[in-house]
Amino acid sequence: PVYGSAAKWCEIRDCVFDDAWFKGGGGTAYTGWDRCWDCLMENVETFKMRHAPLFQWAASGCVIRKSVFHESDGQWHSGWTNENLIEQCVIESALGNGGYGYGMWASPPEDAAHGPNGPRNVVYNCDVSSPKAGLWMGGMNENWLILHNRFTADSGPGVFAKATSFDHIIKDNVFVLKDGKSPMVSLNGADCIGIELTGNALYGGNGKIVSGKAQPSLAENNQTLPLGPTTRPAPSVPSIYEWQLRNLKP
């Protein structure tokens, strides 16, 4: 793996990591932050890792930004990761290197080896493509912010919330669903409540903004459009990280 472990205020910048010699077990071929706090990864490019970008084991306050990840999936992999930011990244998920095939994946609470992930993780201004669902949340996820991204999925929904996944804001994203049968957002559990869906555009899929056992608390200004060429969202504030550096006083 290439990640910080048990670290604070560390940086990994301006690097290329090309493949891994072993991908056969837990902890191998990861790129990200493990038991880390307030760390930064910037301008990194990876090829053929298993899980990249990745947060795990209570990583909190970490940022991964302006990076490109080829043939691996984004992960909140274990242990109550919370309040982390992924922004301005490109993730090209693929099967074959040990990734799960989702664009981004968060471990479920019933997984005894990994456990659930915590609140207020943020995905901002990213471009994510995958064979399976764009974002798969296993449960106990609270108040995640999914803003100004493009998700392109060969099959499955744009966002899948399994159970007890609640109070998320999913706003101003573009979802490109190629299978012709999936909704933009699937709320699998009746306890997936308090979710806001605003200003999103669905291209393809089954033409439904949301399906499942729960309904969003707010759904407005969402569009459904035929499958076709799209462009990424262009938020007026491209980077939360840079905005904070400019505007928040020490």
Question: Which residues does each PLM region occupy?
Answer:
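Extracellular parallel beta-helix/beta-solenoid repeat domains
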Residues: P1-P250
